[in-house]
């Protein structure tokens, strides 16, 4: 399941485009949360990679980058995207949402789809997630952070989906 998302698929690795600087935009409307403040050690301690999180105001998740969908989890609570420059992002909607087994989540993409910034990825029932999950805070991490030459966070507090630029990245050449 994690083979393509974490760069273990040799075919996908060899097809990576030449490195370029790219922007990661907010995938949700909400309040920016520092990754270290996410109430889950897997994300707060950057075990999955570095990034940011958003406390969402609504249940509409859009693509934070242009790229290819490399993973849509069966429970629809997480999506993996690979950018043309080779960065691999994981958007994990809420915390402990895997236990909801897809209830309240509607995916608008599938593996192999090409997306642009702002394209709909997943809609979810925010009230149901508040009720059934540990938290609505949604981490967005670059899972191949060790392959980046540039990772610069921009200052922001409130985010607008598909519009607020949050991170500049560039994969090493």
UniProtKB/Swiss-Prot annotation:
Q: Which SUPFAM superfamilies match?
A: Duplicated hybrid motif
Q: Which residues form the active site?
A: 92 (tele-phosphohistidine intermediate)
Q: Where is the PTS EIIA type-1 domain?
A: 40-144
List the Gene3D superfamilies hit by this protein, alphabetically: Glucose Permease (Domain IIA)
According to its UniProt entry, the protein's GO biological process terms are:
phosphoenolpyruvate-dependent sugar phosphotransferase system
- Report whether Phosphoprotein shows up as a keyword of the record: yes
List residues binding Zn(2+).
77, 92
Which domain of life, per UniProt?
Bacteria
Q: Supply the alphabetized keyword list.
A: Cytoplasm, Kinase, Metal-binding, Phosphoprotein, Phosphotransferase system, Sugar transport, Transferase, Transport, Zinc
UniProt cross-references to Pfam families, sorted A to Z: PTS_EIIA_1
What GO molecular functions are on record for this protein? kinase activity; metal ion binding
Keyword match Kinase: yes
Task: Tell me the cofactors it needs.
Answer: Zn(2+)
InterPro entries referenced in this protein's UniProt entry, alphabetically: Dup_hybrid_motif, PTS_EIIA_1_perm, PTS_EIIA_component
Residue numbers marked as site, Important for phospho-donor activity:
77
What does the record note about the cofactor? Answer: Binds 1 zinc ion per glycerol kinase EIIA-Glc dimer. The zinc ion is important for dimerization.
- Recorded domain comment: The EIIA domain is phosphorylated by phospho-HPr on a histidyl residue. Then, it transfers the phosphoryl group to the EIIB domain.
Q: How does it assemble?
A: Heterodimer with glycerol kinase (glpk).
* Functional note: The phosphoenolpyruvate-dependent sugar phosphotransferase system (sugar PTS), a major carbohydrate active transport system, catalyzes the phosphorylation of incoming sugar substrates concomitantly with their translocation across the cell membrane. The enzyme II complex composed of PtsG and Crr is involved in glucose transport.
**Full protein name:** PTS system glucose-specific EIIA component
């Amino acid at each position: 399941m994690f083979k393509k998302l974490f760069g273990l698929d040799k075919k996908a690795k060899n097809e990576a485009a030449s490195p370029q600087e790219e922007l990661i935009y907010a995938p949700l409307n909400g309040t920016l949360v520092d990754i270290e403040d996410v109430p889950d050690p897997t994300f707060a301690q950057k075990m999955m990679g570095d990034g940011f999180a958003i406390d969402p105001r609504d249940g509409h998740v859009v693509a934070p980058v242009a790229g290819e969908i490399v993973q849509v989890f069966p429970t629809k609570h997480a999506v993996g995207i690979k950018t043309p420059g080779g960065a691999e992002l994981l958007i994990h909607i809420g915390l402990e949402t895997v236990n909801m087994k897809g209830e309240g989540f509607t995916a608008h993409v599938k593996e192999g789809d090409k997306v642009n910034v702002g394209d709909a990825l997943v809609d979810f029932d925010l009230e149901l997630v508040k009720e059934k999950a540990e938290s609505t805070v949604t981490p967005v991490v670059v899972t191949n952070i060790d392959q980046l030459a540039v990772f610069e966070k921009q200052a922001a507090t409130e985010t607008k989906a598909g519009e607020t630029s949050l991170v500049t990245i560039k994969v090493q050449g």
